[in-house]
């Protein structure tokens, strides 16, 4: 039962953080496409690790990450207002590169497939 509750909390916080990032943060540095891939809230509801994937060039990624990290107080306040929890978790932003790694692996597999078809 506790795992089910934790999963619901994680999904609810993920949905709200995503909405906050896309609709409420007005930082001009947030120009790259930012996607919330996962959220892990600790059992005591003190911390919420928010995993984000940022698409764009390296400069845009760095600026977007800095914008997100400078907005953690605002994000925490909004999460506390929108999600009714005993404690409002402290938001920790982490970069998730799994989507980029997956795209790179897909490109490698595609190039291998092309090389095999050219050899035949």
From Swiss-Prot:
The keyword Cytoplasm applies. Transmembrane segments: none annotated. GO terms for cellular component: cytosol. One of its GO terms (molecular function) is ribosomal small subunit binding. It comes from Clostridium botulinum (strain Langeland / NCTC 10281 / Type F). Pfam families: RBFA (PF02033). It is found in: Cytoplasm. NCBIfam families: rbfA. HAMAP family: RbfA. Keywords: Cytoplasm, Ribosome biogenesis. Belongs to the RbfA family. InterPro entries: KH_dom-like_a/b, RbfA, RbfA_dom_sf, Ribosome-bd_factorA_CS. PANTHER family: RIBOSOME-BINDING FACTOR A, CHLOROPLASTIC-RELATED. It comes from the Bacteria. Its main location: cytoplasm. Signal peptide: none annotated. One of its GO terms (biological process) is maturation of SSU-rRNA. One of several proteins that assist in the late maturation steps of the functional core of the 30S ribosomal subunit. Associates with free 30S ribosomal subunits (but not with 30S subunits that are part of 70S ribosomes or polysomes). Required for efficient processing of 16S rRNA. May interact with the 5'-terminal helix region of 16S rRNA. Monomer. Binds 30S ribosomal subunits, but not 50S ribosomal subunits or 70S ribosomes. This is Ribosome-binding factor A.
């Amino acid at each position: 039962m506790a795992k089910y509750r934790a999963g619901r909390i994680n999904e609810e916080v993920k949905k709200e953080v995503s909405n906050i990032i896309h609709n409420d943060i007005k930082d001009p540095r947030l120009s790259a496409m930012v996607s919330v891939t996962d959220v892990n809230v600790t059992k005591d509801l003190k911390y919420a690790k928010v995993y984000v994937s940022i698409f764009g060039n390296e400069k845009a990624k760095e600026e977007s990450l800095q914008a997100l990290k400078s907005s953690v107080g605002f994000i925490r306040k909004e999460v506390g207002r929108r999600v009714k929890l005993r404690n409002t978790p402290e938001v920790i932003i982490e970069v998730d590169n799994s989507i980029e790694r997956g795209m790179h692996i897909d490109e490698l597999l595609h190039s291998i497939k092309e090389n095999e078809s050219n050899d035949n």
